[in-house]
Each structure stands twice: as structure tokens, then as C-alpha cells.
Amino acid sequence: MPKASHQDLRFAFRELLASGSCYHTASVFDPMSARIAADLGFEVGILGGSVASLQVLAAPDFALITLSEFVEQATRIGRVAQLPVLADADHGYGNALNVMRTVIELERAGVAALTIEDTLLPAQFGRKSTDLIPVEEGVGKIRAALEARVDSSLSIIARTNAGVLSTEEIIVRTQSYQKAGADAICMVGVKDFEQLEQIAGHLSVPLMLVTYANPNLHDDERLARLGVRIVVDGHAAYFAAIKATYDCLRLQRGQQNKSENLTATELSHTYTQPEDYIRWAKEYMSVDE
């Protein structure tokens, strides 16, 4: 079978956005997982920012990974991927000019689409970790991203957090990003279908949801009718890999009979030590969770 080019995969992603169906992403974090996801028939994969931080730095999701580190991992995946890969580009690694550099590098890496979010990252002195940038700044980032891409088939997706503002404020933000030219709108923190319907009724571009398997949003047909085309349930495959590594090495060391049997979430917490970063952020930056 002939290998699909990066542009082929970008067109394939756009076909997903233009369809009438809802697709769930595979968590793709290295070349092997990309090949497995494609072989199993997944229509789209995602390289999550949090997963990249874990894979590259063994660090929690505190915007610690650099653009070059993220792009290197995306490039490794892009060499072999035969499914469209969506890159979670966080805040674009800086201001609107940094966003342009991010788009240039990720386009060269071969991703089919990328999200740029309006969270105030990295955490700022004296601010909450969930604060968002002004909508005007977010619009500037989306416009800059569109200007920077060379291949117009690369999808630029604006992401915002529906869990930290009122529904009315989220509607204003998403409409602004749509007007700026975003190919799709991604939202995290949508509570239920009632909230989603209120927001979706004001938008015409395709939607992407990061649900983390929210049981209140478990209806693909209803999601599709509301314009949702991409759903990110989380990154279970990556955490399963952590658990499998731990269990295998534990068995190899003859420790399988010990009472300790940590879950994947507990293992991630143990080996990334997020409480240290939270303490440092409070001590040195007065950051409020």
C-alpha cells in the first residue's frame, strides 16, 4: 500500500471535519503508538501536550516542555504516521509571534492539525493557573497561526476552557475565534449537553471536545448532530503503557508478591511528583491553583 503524504493526511483530517460523524482520537505519543493506532483503524490520533511532557521530561503538565522538544517528538511520529495526527500545541509557546514559529515547525513535522489555546501559559506570578488571556490576544494568536501556515490544508483549531467562564463568555470567545478564521473550535470543560447546545447554536465551524470521558456527554450521535467531529476522551493508552512498564519491571525484580500495586494514575503521580511543582509555583510565583 502506498504511503500517505503529510498533505494526504491533512486532507483526510479535513474530511473528518466536513463529515457528519463524531470521531474519537487515539493517544499517539511515539512512532510505535502511531503505527498501532493506524493499524487498528483509528481515523485520527492526538499528541497531547501533557503526554509529551510525561514522555519527554517525566514531568507533569505545567507547560515545562519547550517548543523544540515538542516538535522533535511530533517529527518522530510524523515520519511513520499513516493516520492524521493532531498536535496539542498548548498556548503556541508564547505570544502571537511565537505561535507563528510553532505553526511553521509543526507543519514541517507533518502534523495534520494543531490546537492553540487561550489559557494564560506558563503560569504567571500572582495569577490563577486557569486564567485565560484576553479574547483580543487569543484572536491575534489565531490570525497569526493562519498567516504562518504554508500548506492551507493544515487545520488550525482554536481551543478554550468552557469550565472557567460563564457560557455567555465562552460564546463570545468561540464566536471571535470563528470570525478570526479558525478551522474548528476545541473546548475543554463542557459540563453537559445543555451547555454544549447553547454554545453550538452560535457556531458554524466544526467542534472538538476534550471530555476526559465525561459521562454526561456519552452520545456520539447527539454530539455529531451538534457539530462535534473530534472527541478526546483522554490518554488511556499512554497511562496503560506506564502501568505495563511498571508491572513488567516489578515482576523482573521479583517484587510481584508485594502488597503495593499502584494504579496508572498513582504511578504517574509518583514518578512526576506534581506536588513539588505546585509548591514551587506557590512559593516563588504566588500562583493560586
Curated annotation (Swiss-Prot):
Alphabetical UniProt keywords: Decarboxylase, Lyase, Magnesium, Metal-binding
Gene3D superfamilies: Phosphoenolpyruvate-binding domains
Cofactor list: Mg(2+)
InterPro entries, sorted: ICL/PEPM, Oxaloacetate_deCOase_bac, Pyrv/PenolPyrv_kinase-like_dom, Pyrv_kinase-like_dom_sf
Pfam families with a match to the protein in the record: PEP_mutase
Chemical reaction(s) catalysed: oxaloacetate + H(+) = pyruvate + CO2
E.C. no: 4.1.1.112
Protein role: Catalyzes the decarboxylation of oxaloacetate into pyruvate. Seems to play a role in maintaining cellular concentrations of bicarbonate and pyruvate.
Subunit architecture: Homotetramer; dimer of dimers.
Name of the protein this chain belongs to: Oxaloacetate decarboxylase 1
